Amino acid sequence: VTNFFLDRDVINAVPHRLKKQIIFFGKWTRSDNTVGLQWFFEEVGAYMDKSIKIIIIGTGLPVEMVKRLKEYKNVEYRGFVENPYQMIADSLLVVSPLFSGAGVKVKVVESLACGTPVLGTSIAFEGIDKKFKKFMLEAEVPEDYICCINSLNISLDDRKQFKESFLKNYNEHSIVNFVTEKI
């Protein structure tokens, strides 16, 4: 049963064209997010295809980290974005290297609902049905991240079909449906 609401912007974000970019999405005042981002740039960033743009969305990224990220030509820190979901839908994937935290990660569910694959640790996918594993790309070591980013090939049609299937499942298992059935 899903116990949170998907915003209309998430539902309306449909992949139109795949841009050669990956997204990091989160509240950067949360240490589990910043630790994962820092790990990614220390262990993965130098080895991935430099033609792939890395976009970081969300508030609170520490000033020191923002300064370090400016050293990378293919990295852009956007900070707060009013509606990031179309950008997410049109990206190759969302990256979520989490090494701590508990429960379902809303950013992962929102990304999947946009039809966008998510590359992350097992912690990133806690509580999400494994039937969506084609778009839940689990990686624990840098080599797996590098390989996945540099070789990901999921078609636009597959992403649109996945989005439709994911949202159908989400709606069927939403807590709102269970509450209204009991009333």
Which residues make up each language-model segment?
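Short hydrophobic beta-strand element within catalytic cores of glycosyltransferases
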Residues: 94, 107-111, 117-121
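Glycosyltransferase donor-binding loop in the core domain
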Residues: 26-32, 103, 137, 167
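Conserved acidic donor-binding segment of nucleotide-sugar-dependent glycosyltransferases
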Residues: 135-143, 149-156
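Short Ser/Thr-rich beta->loop micro-motif in glycosyltransferases that lines
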Residues: 79, 96-102, 123
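Short acidic/histidine- and often glycine-rich active-site loop of Leloir-type glycosyltransferases
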Residues: 122-138
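A charged, aromatic-enriched C-terminal amphipathic alpha-helix characteristic of glycosyltransferases
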Residues: 153-183
